[in-house]
C-alpha cells in the first residue's frame, strides 16, 4: 500500500515538473513570436515611410512609389497615389 501511494505521489511530482517546463517553453515561444511580429511591423513601417502605396494619401512631403503618381480625387485637399500604368523593374 505504501509503495502504491509513493508511486502516485512520485508520478504527480513528475507531471508537475513536466507541466511547469512545458508552460515555461510555451511562454518563451509566445514572447519570441511577439518579438518577431514587432520586428516585422517596424520593418514595414520603415518601408511605408519611404513612399506611399496604392490609394495612399500623398502630398509634396509624402511622395508616391515609383510606379504610382499623385492625383487629385474627390476633394481639393485630398490627393491619392494611383497607378501610372507602368510596372516596377526588379
UniProtKB/Swiss-Prot annotation:
The keyword Disulfide bond applies. Residues 1-19 form the signal peptide. Disulfide bonds join 51-65, 58-70, 64-81. GO terms for molecular function: ion channel inhibitor activity; toxin activity. Ion channel inhibitor. Expressed by the venom gland. It is found in: Secreted. The presence of a 'disulfide through disulfide knot' structurally defines this protein as a knottin. It comes from the Eukaryota. This is U7-theraphotoxin-Hhn1h. Residues 20-50 form a propeptide. The keyword Transcription does not apply. It holds the Pfam family Toxin_12. Its main location: secreted. It comes from Cyriopagopus hainanus (Chinese bird spider). Coiled coil: none annotated. Keywords: Disulfide bond, Ion channel impairing toxin, Knottin, Secreted, Signal, Toxin. Belongs to the neurotoxin 10 (Hwtx-1) family. 13 (Hntx-13) subfamily. One of its GO terms (cellular component) is extracellular region.
